[in-house]
Amino acid sequence: MIKHNKLIYLLLLSPIVIANSNVEEIVTTGSLINNSEKDASPVDVVTREDFENFNILNFAEISKFLTSSSGSHFQTNALEGVDQGMASITLRGLDHSSTLLLLNSKRHTFAGTPSNQGQGYIDVNIVPEIAIKQIEILKEGATSLYGSDAVAGVVNVLTQKDFEGFKLRINNSKTANYSQSDKSLGLLMGSNYKNGNYVFGLNILERSALSA
């Protein structure tokens, strides 16, 4: 009877010994440097309501209302250079390739032609102003996250993905002496389905020459 008890005892212990042999060592490395978990990068948000209040005709014109922007590189009526009709937003007074433009938090390809200085940039005119939901502007360098094209900051454009219906906007504006005029047409339409949706946006801007 004693021999049988010893055999049962060994059988019960054997699985426990095997399980313990598979345990791996875990090493946790920490830092003693004090920091605040509430620290955040400075981000400006421009909503759809802000766009209506600014009364702007295209995305590039938003740069006139950003405190961290050096303006937009806009050459609609230029007579020289290779990038007429294109536009880019630059932050902190740096060149065009130092500000990263994201469309719905995703990268986009550069414009087909470089700037007059040979720099590659994203043409913001590809984004219909009427389809923009809001814009997020990161006002400091983010090269550790996005690379060297985010030295000056990041501009993230969010579009109206869930728009349903039809929207048409026509605008005609002139200078005080009628020497220059802007005519714009904006179209936005969308519909939601059971398994998805679609949104179509279009902006057309015709700007006449400014008489000196």
Label each region the model flagged:
Residues N35, K64-R107:
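Extracytoplasmic beta-strand/coil segments of soluble accessory domains associated
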Residues S41-K64, I89-L94, G120-N125, N172-A176, ...:
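Short, polar/charged loop or turn motifs at beta-strand boundaries
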Residues I62, L100, E136-L138, V154-Q160, ...:
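Predominantly transmembrane beta-strands of Gram-negative outer membrane beta-barrel pores used
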Residues M1-N22:
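Cleavable N-terminal targeting peptides that direct proteins into the secretory/outer-membrane pathway or into
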Residues F59-I62, L66, I89-T90, N104, ...:
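N-terminal periplasmic accessory domains that precede
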Residues K106-K139:
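Short acidic/polar hinge/loop motifs at secondary-structure boundaries
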Residues I33, S68, H108, S173-T175, ...:
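Structural signature of outer-membrane beta-barrel domains
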Residues E25-F54, A60, A111-N116, F166:
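N-terminal periplasmic "start-of-domain" segments of outer-membrane beta-barrel proteins
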